[in-house]
Swiss-Prot record:
EC number: 5.3.1.24
Protein name, UniProt field: N-(5'-phosphoribosyl)anthranilate isomerase
Family recorded in the similarity comment: Belongs to the TrpF family.
Gene behind this protein: trpF
Top-level EC class: isomerase
GO MF annotations, alphabetized: phosphoribosylanthranilate isomerase activity
One BP term from GO: L-tryptophan biosynthetic process
Record-linked InterPro entries: Aldolase_TIM, PRAI_dom, RibuloseP-bd_barrel, TrpF_fam
Provenance organism: Pseudomonas syringae pv. syringae (strain B728a)
Length: 206
């Protein structure tokens, strides 16, 4: 099996982005959802991206953003990939002509395979924990047994991952990538360098 990729999401500070890169993360996530405690402005995002070393993928997270808002962000910020956490339709996601992943908050009875088929142009599906009224960043895990074995898209596993459980998650789910936010924080939006290092060591089995 190929090495599992990793994304540190909810980055709000340059020092946290650099800590993620130095620890071996493949990507960082920048939240463009004003209601989130991890939200960044365009100016913050540009400063963070400008400080990154080469080959770190920058992912912009959006929740039901208007086309105007999203286009303004894309014009101002050099994002490599989009991540949609709201009720965006496949047509809306496709309309920006950027690589994207679609997030699904998983609960019993969800047709995850059907979502993958519906969002046929998505590069992957991000599976997160369902908490009513919260689009992501809950800090809670979900039942990984709900994930089908035969999905036709790369799975990015999120939801309550920490250095204590990510190795088990990788062994059970065998995802393409893992995504962490709260599990490597001191407080919402403020990352902890030691927690990032511990998480990445667990991902890499070192």
């Amino acid at each position: 099996m190929s090495a599992v990729r990793s994304k540190i999401c909810g980055i709000t500070r340059i020092e946290d982005a650099l800590a993620a890169a130095e620890a071996g993360a493949d990507a960082i996530g920048l939240v463009f959802y004003p209601k989130s405690p991890r939200a960044v402005t365009v100016l913050q995002a540009r400063a963070i991206i400008a400080a990154l070393p080469p080959f770190i993928t920058t992912v912009g997270l959006f929740v039901n953003a208007s086309r105007c808002e999203l286009n303004e962000t894309l014009d101002a910020v050099a994002l490599d990939m989009l991540q949609f956490h709201g009720d965006e339709t496949p047509e809306e996601c496709d309309g920006y002509h950027r690589p994207y992943v679609k997030a699904l908050r998983v609960k019993a009875g969800d047709d995850i395979a059907g979502v993958c088929r519906t969002y046929r142009n998505a590069r992957g599906v991000l599976l997160d924990t369902y908490v009513e009224g919260v689009p992501g960043g809950t800090g809670e895990t979900f039942d990984w047994a709900l994930i089908p074995d035969d999905l036709d898209k790369p799975v990015i596993l999120a939801g309550g991952l920490t250095s204590a459980n990510v190795a088990q998650a990788i062994a059970q789910v065998r995802p393409y990538a893992v995504d962490v936010s709260g599990g490597v924080e001191k407080s919402k939006g403020i990352k902890d360098r030691e927690k990032i290092l511990a998480f990445m060591s667990a991902v890499h089995g070192t």
